[in-house]
Amino acid sequence: MLSARVLKNTGFLRKQCPLCKSYFWTLRRDQEYCGDQPCVPYGFIGNPPTKISIDSLTELRERFLRFFERRGHARIKRYPVVARWRDDVYLVGASIYDFQPWVTSGAVPPPANPLVISQPSIRLTDVDKVGRSGRHLTGFEMMAHHAFNYPDKFIYWIDETAEYAYEFFTKELGIPPEEITFKESIWEGGGNAGECFEVLVRGLEVATLVFMHYEVKEGKYVELPLKIVDTGYGLERIYWLIRGTPTIYDAVFGPYLDKARRSLGFPEPPSELMGKASVYFGQMDPEVIGLEKAYDIIAEKIGVDPKWLREVFKPQEALYVLADHSRTVSWMIADGVIPSNSGAGYLARLLLRRILKNLKLVGVETPLVELFDMHLKELKADYPEVWEARNLILELVDIEERKYREILKSAPGVVKKAYEEARRRGRAGFDAEDLVSLYDSFGLPPEIVAETAKSLGVEVKIPDDFYSRLAARHAKREKQPEKTLVEMAKIADLPRTRELFYEDPYMKSFKAKVLRVIDGKYVVLDQTAFYAEGGGQPADIGILKHGGGAAKVVDVQRVGHVIVHVVEGEAPPEGSEVVGEIDWDRRYALMKMHTGTHVLIQSIRRVLGPHIWQAGAQKDIPASRIDVTHFKLPTAEEVAEIERLANSVVQANMPVHVKILPRNEAEAKYGFILYQGGVVPAREIRVVQIGPDEAPYDVQACGGTHLKSTGEIGLIKIQKVERIADGVVRFIFTTGLHALKYVQEIERQVAEAASLAGGNRDNLVDSVRRLLQRAEEAERKAQRYTELYAAEFVKNLKAEPVGKYRLAVVELEDEELAKKVAQIATGRDKELVLLVVGGGRVTVYTGGADVGPIVKALREVGFRGGGSRTFAQGVYSGDVKTLIDAVKRALA
């Protein structure tokens, strides 16, 4: 049983719902049901439970934050919606995500205790219901207060949490106490769990009060060292309750919906009808009865024709989807998400395509950027960071819409080919996995597949939760398997290795004691200056000298708290002293590459925009690479500016500072740009700052070895820029002497090219231009001569009758000449079949005959190839007479 002091002191009664069997607390002796959907209908639509007037989400949010500030809670800024501090999920799904796993595990203290926040959150688990149910959103603000109770420091727990909720809803919002129900439940999310109260008013859940004290490990609950108050008050839901509008969308997005309706020429929906439909929809489980079936049931309940109800609802549904999804996508892009085929970008693209699909189904042709821009103006006050990203958001939306339109053009061909493939496999149509494959491979929404399949006489059943399934598949990050050289059990008793490479990155040699040798090749020292592979920087190599012998160090890896050296040759004995010598030239070159990487990625960000985030990196010699999130290939001018900016930082000889800071302090000071290089799993963070404290050029959490100043880099040279995936651009670059060698090689090639062109470097462009002009003139003459020769060749072409066709066989090595001969000959003679052999190729041209039977006959004698209806080409290594006989058999 879950109870609280305020419930007992104010006379709440504990009851059990006869429908869902949940226990709940209420002041009403006559209350029979739990007060939650679907056990009871909404009772607030058109009938709000409070007289207090709150005119905006902004006002409601501020009331909540101030309420808890007055009660000793520190207000903290909202976190990004992209969870860059986590390695398990892409998006923040609740305010507690901000503090998982570091704070909830006890590894890091919270930024304040207790605290209050209003956190934008994104959940796509119910994306298919958005626009239809009247209450579901993909993006919402979770207003929350949190308290973290330690064994030696108690803040507050169940009694105070329930009391705060009771006071907020009754005193701050003016809701009568008898309208409030506290329903007992269990909450689980983000790897943690605990008992909870769901706070309900007139059938709507407006808050969840979770008392988290479990970690979920392999499906089992394990006690946490902390007891955490994890609350969630739905900003949008509470505002809907207060306004009593037909749907949550009308409350949250009212002004935008009005403008969008006028712009698109949509009629105002009958509010009474929408309200009734929302009430009934809330009581149904669409996952059980089906979304389309739900329309039929609702139509029957309110006494209207189902077809008419759909006609009224569909435009509104498209608008509601537009309003919700456009805000969510704008949040994501403003936080650096680029729509793509993977990661968080996949989820952003899914939402954009769902908008476009719904608008197309109701005949909207208005460019999506216009509808987005209209919404961005409404969001400007509450989310200034979204408005700052306006140009980027609109550009990406435009790109995505153009891609979508191209996808729709390809639909008939793609669907037909997929259907033919399904039939070859003995299947009559498309199943759910086929629809997923068509979406992921070609971007085709299932509704478009179904529409196209109708023309083939195929009926397609679309799962009601199709988009939710897609989102679930892509919601979590894939964990990379850890590289383990030795079993932890073999080194668990050893002390932590002292990391000399951090204490002095310029240390070239050192002395150490051998603590353990495993399998004759894995060596653990008490201290080491050999850098262990990590953060995209390769491990150091070198030598371990011992006694009269030496062993090559070929790899260095972290295994838990110790550093393991992989050696070749005679391993030093345990207990002996060794002298380690690092391959310094290689290490120093890698330090230049690593510091150069930080300089370059910040330069890319400053030129291309703040949406740039590192998507991967590898420091190596003679060249390194950085992969960044970007939606198009940078122009030559942009690349030149990036290179210029990076080298200006090198020339400025900025200091490079390394600081060890508590995680919270580092995040508060620098923000989540710290995690440009990825998640750092530590209580304290090693921060690498380029530039002075008052105006740093770049700041990142990093475990690599770095230079003392940027001047040591010498030179940064970008060698190549390419798109390696949708939404990802790769920069290949080099630094220092390797950069100089690269430039010198380019100079050598330029000089050689100039010499070959008959000039020098100063007039190379003019020389090449003259050569190209001559080459073009020669090409024109060659084409003319080919045409003349082909025409003469055709005059002498001999063909023999075979069936109703005429067969000519010629031997030609020149493929261009063969094409021209075939073009002239088959153009004049529609019954001609021309067989061309030569150059290792066999080609068949026809004036009109179907080449299919000919190809079939040729394959029987060893021909490998294919083509179109009147053309086929391939290879054949057998006797030419056998080839000719096969063609004759096909034509006879």
From Swiss-Prot:
The keyword Transcription does not apply. It is an enzyme of class 6 (ligase). PROSITE patterns: AA_TRNA_LIGASE_II_ALA. GO terms for cellular component: cytoplasm. Pfam families: tRNA-synt_2c, tRNA_SAD. It is found in: Cytoplasm. It comes from the Archaea. InterPro entries: aa-tRNA-synth_II/BPL/LPL, Ala-tRNA-lgiase_IIc, Ala-tRNA-ligase_IIc_anticod-bd, Ala-tRNA-synth_IIc_core, Ala-tRNA-synth_IIc_N, Ala-tRNA_lgiase_arc, Ala-tRNA_ligase, Thr/Ala-tRNA-synth_IIc_edit. One of its GO terms (biological process) is alanyl-tRNA aminoacylation. Its cofactor is Zn(2+). SMART domains: tRNA_SAD. Keywords: Aminoacyl-tRNA synthetase, ATP-binding, Cytoplasm, Ligase, Metal-binding, Nucleotide-binding, Protein biosynthesis, RNA-binding, tRNA-binding, Zinc. One of its GO terms (molecular function) is tRNA binding. Belongs to the class-II aminoacyl-tRNA synthetase family. PANTHER family: ALANINE--TRNA LIGASE, CYTOPLASMIC (PTHR11777:SF9), ALANYL-TRNA SYNTHETASE (PTHR11777). This is Alanine--tRNA ligase.
